């Protein structure tokens, strides 16, 4: 190959290499974006010990130490709740980017509704199942929370509040599932609900989630199961 031809060949190779590199740089951000997971697991209880409360779940009171424990069925571990005359939350710390992952997703099923439970009245405000998103607010008054409830009798879509307005409640389900023991998956846009319920525009930074199966107001008993907590992009 002549010297001039060699220079021309090398120059062409350099141009081609530069063009390829530029294309890679151009598409690199989109490749990284695609690699981001659509969902992040908060807890699927896969590594938890059956018969115990997972160590990273904390009880609001020691009176709830016998309420929550991990149970198992084929191919699934989950958090089982059995409340006998008590009402104690179990919470897990978990911070996430709510703007990027606005959807809160989980599965649940009621096994026993508290006798006479009606979340609209303070004297009967017990639920078989409730899930919270917690947002730091005050060391004295506690966090702000969006609470999702499976009620026995309160109509779906009902809006309630408690804790002097710091807890905003939305009834997601009402009545027994079609089949006893049937799991139901929920997908809620908790960011939209938070902004709407608290009438704010800014995106908060969640501190974690909580569950509550309670029967203290009705002095009865309640049971339910929770599984596969995660946050998703959509």
Regions found by a protein language model. Give the residues of each.
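Extracellular carbohydrate-recognition regions
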Residues: 34-60
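Extracellular beta-strand elements of beta-rich domains used
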Residues: 45, 209, 227-231
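Short carbohydrate-recognition loop motifs
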Residues: 66-89
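Extracellular/lumenal carbohydrate-interaction signature centered on repeated Trp-anchored short motifs
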Residues: 93-104, 177-180
